[in-house]
């Protein structure tokens, strides 16, 4: 019944969302570079 677990879960959720955000930006950058080179 400690309140440290929800905080840790929130941190993990933030890290996961940040990771997927960076991955999405990377994929969009690759697609944009492919379109610009073509």
Swiss-Prot record:
UniProt GO cellular component terms: chloroplast thylakoid membrane; photosystem II reaction center
Database matches in SUPFAM superfamilies: Photosystem II reaction center protein L, PsbL
GO biological process, alphabetically ordered: photosynthesis
UniProt-annotated location(s): Plastid, Chloroplast thylakoid membrane
Highest taxon in the source lineage: Eukaryota
Alphabetized Pfam families for the sequence: PsbL
This protein's UniProt keywords: Chloroplast, Membrane, Photosynthesis, Photosystem II, Plastid, Reaction center, Thylakoid, Transmembrane, Transmembrane helix
Keyword Ribonucleoprotein on entry: no
Transmembrane segments: 17-37
Signal peptide limits: none
Bilayer disposition of the protein: Single-pass membrane protein
Subunit and partners: PSII is composed of 1 copy each of membrane proteins PsbA, PsbB, PsbC, PsbD, PsbE, PsbF, PsbH, PsbI, PsbJ, PsbK, PsbL, PsbM, PsbT, PsbX, PsbY, PsbZ, Psb30/Ycf12, at least 3 peripheral proteins of the oxygen-evolving complex and a large number of cofactors. It forms dimeric complexes.
Function, in words: One of the components of the core complex of photosystem II (PSII). PSII is a light-driven water:plastoquinone oxidoreductase that uses light energy to abstract electrons from H(2)O, generating O(2) and a proton gradient subsequently used for ATP formation. It consists of a core antenna complex that captures photons, and an electron transfer chain that converts photonic excitation into a charge separation. This subunit is found at the monomer-monomer interface and is required for correct PSII assembly and/or dimerization.
Family listed: Belongs to the PsbL family.
The protein's name: Photosystem II reaction center protein L
Species: Cycas taitungensis
């Amino acid at each position: 019944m400690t309140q440290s677990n929800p905080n840790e879960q929130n941190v993990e959720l933030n890290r996961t969302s940040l990771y997927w955000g960076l991955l999405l930006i990377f994929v969009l950058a690759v697609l944009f570079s492919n379109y610009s080179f073509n």
